[in-house]
């Protein structure tokens, strides 16, 4: 980065492992460029490596396996325009690598399992998003990612999913209560008995009353749009689109 920003905007993106956070943000960073946006994976603040977690009988989702004090101090420093020496968690080896220098940037996105868990970190954020992925979709995505990108076996992935589920319910899922926007991804209702998970149902839920953030209005409130491609012909492989906009209650919020 060549110019020090006048103000650092801090965005938090929370969600379970394998829900698409890193993939989405890598593409966002490619779009805006490194001179404008920096993405930090909060896995880098694991205080225990993979072997140590196994020996201690804890998962990476457990707060005991993460250094929230260092996370808070370094994110606060970046927000104040200061550079940091951030640790690196190596997903391939499961080890903690030597730190790297991170400079402040116009937009810094902190993504991972716990950006909304610690109140101190949460209060630093200017805006927050929680990715709420259904179990059916999450399992399909995580198997694809961990086997292709991280060298895990199918059995290892399934075992990890089952062992992490209690900690997800205890430490990760409750964070959506604090998010400004929740993006829910569920299996489609347009294809009967869909198993490929290539067509998905997506809901974007925006909290009312967030300062400086106006909700997106796609069409009139209460409207529903149905589009069936090709009419009754059988030449289209895609099922179409169904859209609805209107008020709702989610996790106790309107």
Language model: regions and residue ranges:
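Conserved nucleotide-sensing/catalytic segment adjacent to the nucleotide-binding pocket
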Residues: 35-41, 47-93, 107
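Phosphate-binding P-loop
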Residues: 2-8
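Hydrophobic positions on the alpha1 helix immediately C-terminal to the Walker A/P-loop
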Residues: 24, 28
